[in-house]
Amino acid sequence: MPRGLELLIAQTILQGFDAQYGRFLEVTSGAQQRFEQADWHAVQQAMKSRIHLYDHHVGLVVEQLRCITDGKSTDADFLLRVKEHYTRLLPDYPRFEIAESFFNSVYCRLFDHRSLTPERLFIFSSQPERRFRTIPRPLAKDFFPDHGWEPLLMRILSDLPLRLPWQNKSRDIRYIIAHLTETLGEDALPRCHVQVANELFYRNKAAWLVGKLTTPDGTLPFLLPIHRTDEGELFVDTCLTTTAEASIVFGFARSYFMVYAPLPAALVEWLREILPGKTTAELYMAIGCQKHAKTESYREYLCYLAESDEKFIEAPGIRGMVMLVFTLPGFDRVFKIIKDKFAPQKEMSAAHVRACYQLVKEHDRVGRMADTQEFENFVLDKRQIDPALMALLRQEVPEKITDLGEHIVIRHLYIERRMVPLNIWLEQVEGQQLRDAIEEYGNAIRQLAAANIFPGDMLFKNFGVTRHGRVVFYDYDEICYMTEVNFRDIPPARYPEDELASEPWYSVSPGDVFPEEFRHWLCADPRIGPLFEEMHADLFRADYWRALQTRIKEGHVEDVYAYRRRQRFSVRYGAISSTANSS
């Protein structure tokens, strides 16, 4: 193979990444127009399209390499030299960290996820000392209350690129000042100032102004979700100023933001101050760089593993019928493998389960479905596997593992945020915490349904509780679109004996769901039943579900808020007209 071809291959890969990220920015830049035109279906389509861009461009590069090298690109030693040339191209490259992940993806596609070693891949960055380049233009702008907070906020809102009129800008400014005064105190407010990101963060039906509020006691988030009325007028729905609130807004159960970020590493570093609890992987995930987030997540896992003497164990909770789930006791993630054989009542294939997980990846998760990262040929050191888990792996997933002596290779798995299973949480809490959990569970079901998602299996064990007390769905093997379900009322019994029979007295077809039956397994606990009947009795009525289906089929897209209804300005301070119903 002629010398110089390695450099050509390296340049081809980098050019392929340039093309991918250019398209990524192109799709992202359309977010403002989609918001202004209230084209919510285009918002959903753009989200799916942007996710697919990465794999599409990896495939294009792989085909180019096979043509250029006449198939010899599968020679590992040759690609080692390609990596050396690629590394030399990165010091002057502005998105070097994601370009490294793109190289990894091309390599994995060529080698079918085999021979994944540090010398062949960018397992860790080639430039760890360089998180981001000198920024050619500021990411954010500072605003000081030299003449008071009212003119300061007027400048901020007036500087926004949105081309729609405001419903009542002065009113929104009064509400923001009222919130800041309540939060910080009237004396402290004049000594504070704000730094606001130049780009808006778009997601669902909102445009988020993201900023930092510098106070005498430190820096706080400053988040303003901007919505539009049905008449096309802008309004600020609330103001969020705590790290806990910001963490939920940027949470792992939400869709990725559309934010124009030609230098994503710089934006990640800027966000870190107001999201101190978020890892680098989570921040990249939040801004839509999900493939690089996977790289960062794997690095975080390796760093944890290197400093821990823990053993992998089966995850706490009721053992699943489809997935084998394990974890490290102190690690905040779980590892999920599709079993070789499912329980008899699970009439589905492994391909169906993978399709369900992909559906969740591409769909609006509305803060109620955990994001996952998919890995192939995942290597574990046997010495770090608890014997009980090792036995379980050999029993449940022998076709998914390869024994290499000191290591095993898991052919395919998902990594997901670890949560407390809701059924365990409900056993441990009482009083207001119990009430909050049941309210959260019902709200999760409602918000999923409004987003055209039916969980299928609604048992408490299939949901988890986050560190912020939010209830999130994480078992996807029976998930489907709401519009695919036939919600039915149970027909009246023909005879008294019918209700005692082991078989139903009515016909049941595939896709039939009888919401009345939910009551039997959601309200069996006497502590939970009355709370559920009080807050969520409508979930047991087929007409409730059919009404939601009608709204979905008519094209209605519900508002989903990343904060409590009571935090909305319309609830706290007064009505705002022409808004959709709160979730």
Curated annotation (Swiss-Prot):
InterPro entries: AceK_kinase, AceK_regulatory, Isocitrate_DH_AceK. It comes from the Bacteria. It catalyses: L-seryl-[isocitrate dehydrogenase] + ATP = O-phospho-L-seryl-[isocitrate dehydrogenase] + ADP + H(+). One of its GO terms (cellular component) is cytoplasm. Keywords: ATP-binding, Cytoplasm, Glyoxylate bypass, Hydrolase, Kinase, Nucleotide-binding, Protein phosphatase, Serine/threonine-protein kinase, Transferase, Tricarboxylic acid cycle. It is found in: Cytoplasm. The keyword Transferase applies. ATP binds at residues 315-321, 336. One of its GO terms (molecular function) is AMP binding. One of its GO terms (biological process) is glucose metabolic process. Belongs to the AceK family. This is Isocitrate dehydrogenase kinase/phosphatase. It comes from Salmonella enteritidis PT4 (strain P125109). The gene is aceK.
